Each structure stands twice: as C-alpha cells, then as structure tokens.
C-alpha cells in the first residue's frame, strides 16, 4: 500500500500517529534471487511485489547537485570473477562479480589541493543540473499525492569518493583547507540548484547518503562533523526548511551513535537504516532522542537466517514501541542477505503484519 504525502509527513514528523509504516529499503543481495528461485519463488516474490508493505508514494526531483560531466566508463579487464574499469571520476575500480553491488576504488584522483582544483569544475553550477521538464514532472507528481525528494552529496561520502577514507581522515588534520574547499564548492552548487527548485515546487524531503561508519563507530567524530559537515548541511537545510521542507534524512550504515547529537545539531531529523549488528537499536535510540528523530529500518537482517522463533522475538521487541511512538517506518536494516530462506522471509512479512496490526488495533490507530 502506498501512503500519500500528507499522511506520511504527518506520521514521520510526530504530528499524528497512525497505522504503522513498513518497507523493504534495499531489496535482495546479489545472489539471493537465484537462491529463492531454487526454493520455488514466484516472479512476484523475486521482485518483492508479492509482499505487503506500507510506504510513501515518492518522487525524486530530476536534478543533480554532485559530480557531473564525468568520463565514459572504460573496461580495462574482465574475467569470470571480476571487472576492472576506469569510472566516471577517473578512478580505477574493481567489481567482484556475484558478490558485490558496488565497485571498489583501487586509486583516487585527489591527494592535495592541486588535484582537487583539476576535479573542481565537475562540481560547479551549470544548467545541465536540471532534468528535462523537471518542474512540470514534479508538479504532476505532487498533484498525485507524491512525497517530493531532493538530494545532496554526503559531507563525508563525497570527499571519500574523491580521496578514499584514509586520506580523507588524515586530511582533516593535515589539509583542513582542502576539505573546507571541497564542501564549500559542493554547498554552493547545491544551494543554487535547490534554491531554484524549492522556489518553484514544494520540497518535502532532503536526502543525503553518508555511509561513514562501521561496526565499531564512525570515521568522523563529533568535532569533525561540527567543523566540516555542519556548515554544509546547514546552508542547504536552512534554505529548504524555510520553504517548508520537513524531513532531512541521512543514510549511513554502521554505528552512528557517537555522532548522532552532532548530526541533529546540523539539521538531521531522520536516519536509516539503523543496523542492529552495529549497535543501532531503534528502541534505545527512540528512548534517548524521542520526537527529535524519525527512524527507518531497524529490523536485524541477519535474524532472517535463523529460526522463526528468533525472527518473532526480534519483531516483538522492536515493533510494539515503534507502533506506540510513531515516526518509524520499520524494515530490514539493509539488503536481504544471501542465505535467507524464502520461507523465513514469507514468515517475517506475515509475522510483522500480525504484530503491527495487533498493536495498532490495541492503540486504536487509524
């Protein structure tokens, strides 16, 4: 079931609790469809169309705020196991076939300010950043009740794409002016693009992808978030919030607990996917942050490879407090992992709805 814009925004901003939201954020990992076919899955189950969710009707404005005018990808080497290529940014990347969904950079284009100045033109504003008929298409989507989204590059993620994680972290201390210049350029372009967009259409949702943490914690601490990322985020979010945008949603895997306060101060008010294996317990997060932070995800994907009793226990722990407090679109915390039995996924969906319906009925939610 798709939920209209007004209902989704009322729910995710704590204005009105209603029957719970439920989604699949990322879908199956690369080999899982073959596993499920061998277990008798229908085509509709492979595409997840057979399963019941409740999530917003959404629309992404056709626009670009990040890297543009890249080179055409060039395949350097291809074997049965991997592909090595030069990507749009000029990076040499390696993709492991049958095991990965994203190519891993083997080298990066930026090491210092001189390198960055060669790349910087790809981040400057021009008219190509607006998709064809973007305004008319967005107005049509809004009239149909769709939730309107715009996106910016990550304050950690985009410099990481240019420099790599290790070099970026060193640069915060050894070349801070470089990181400031990168994010200042990105912010300037994002503001110019989104100023025009938000002046013409109602933007509801700002999305940013970071993926800046692992199981043991984030690669930036609160001080780095405050120094480098907050000024960038605030330039964009303050503009959009003044014009009626309501959700600023950050996507970051791993343990983000040490920097959540810093990111809330930077404007974030919604996070996903909330990975339990990394210590992101949505029950504890809700208890700590209350109505300051909406949540998406939070159900442990790994439990689906265990017993049905363990699946039920995970759902009984997570679902009741989220249904009671609202502003949480429940779902798995990442890709459905390889090795997940089809029967377990069917059970997970049915059991989740059983518990959500029970709790919603108990609370009298509509």
Segments (PLM) and residue ranges:
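Active-site loop segments of alpha/beta catalytic cores
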Residues: 1-27, 32-37, 83-86, 95-96, ...
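Segments that shape or occlude catalytic/ligand-binding pockets
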Residues: 32-73
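N-terminal catalytic or cofactor-binding beta/alpha core of small enzyme domains
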Residues: 55-56, 78-81
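Beta-sandwich/jelly-roll carbohydrate-recognition scaffolds of carbohydrate-active enzymes
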Residues: 69, 79, 85-87
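A structural signal for short, hydrophobic beta-strand segments that form beta-sheets
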Residues: 72-77, 100
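Extended Gly/Ser/Thr-rich low-complexity repeat segments
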Residues: 93-108
């Amino acid at each position: 079931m798709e939920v209209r814009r007004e209902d989704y925004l009322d729910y995710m901003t704590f204005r009105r609790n209603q029957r719970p939201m439920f989604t699949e954020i990322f879908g199956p990992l690369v080999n899982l469809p073959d596993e499920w076919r061998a277990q008798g899955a229908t085509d509709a189950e492979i595409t997840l169309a057979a399963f019941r969710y409740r999530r917003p009707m959404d629309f992404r404005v056709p626009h670009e705020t990040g890297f543009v005018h890249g080179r055409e990808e060039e395949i350097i080497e291809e074997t049965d196991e991997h592909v090595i290529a030069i990507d749009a940014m000029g990076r040499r990347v390696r993709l492991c076939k049958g095991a990965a969904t994203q190519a891993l950079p083997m080298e990066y284009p930026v090491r210092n300010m001189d390198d960055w100045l060669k790349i910087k033109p790809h981040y400057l504003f021009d008219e190509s950043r607006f998709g064809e008929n973007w305004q008319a298409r967005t107005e049509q989507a809004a009239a149909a009740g769709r939730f309107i989204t715009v996106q910016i590059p990550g304050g950690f993620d985009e410099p990481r794409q240019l420099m790599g994680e290790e070099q970026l972290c060193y640069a915060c201390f050894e070349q801070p002016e470089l990181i400031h210049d990168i994010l200042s350029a990105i912010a300037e372009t994002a503001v110019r693009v989104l100023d025009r967009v938000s002046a013409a259409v109602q933007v509801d949702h700002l999305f940013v992808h970071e993926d800046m943490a692992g199981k043991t914690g984030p690669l930036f601490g609160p001080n780095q978030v405050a120094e480098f990322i907050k000024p960038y985020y605030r330039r964009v979010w303050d503009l959009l919030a003044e014009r009626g945008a309501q959700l600023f949603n950050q996507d970051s895997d791993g343990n983000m607990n040490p920097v959540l306060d810093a990111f809330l101060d930077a404007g974030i008010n919604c996070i996903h996917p909330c990975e339990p294996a990394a210590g992101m317990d949505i029950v504890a997060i809700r208890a700590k942050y209350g109505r300051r932070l909406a949540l998406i995800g939070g159900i442990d994907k790994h439990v689906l490879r265990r017993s049905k009793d363990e699946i039920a226990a995970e759902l009984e722990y997570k679902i009741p407090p989220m249904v009671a407090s609202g502003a949480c679109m429940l779902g798995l915390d990442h890709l459905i992992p390889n090795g997940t039995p089809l029967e377990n996924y069917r059970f997970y969906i049915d059991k989740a709805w059983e518990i959500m319906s029970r709790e919603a009925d108990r609370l009298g939610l509509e």
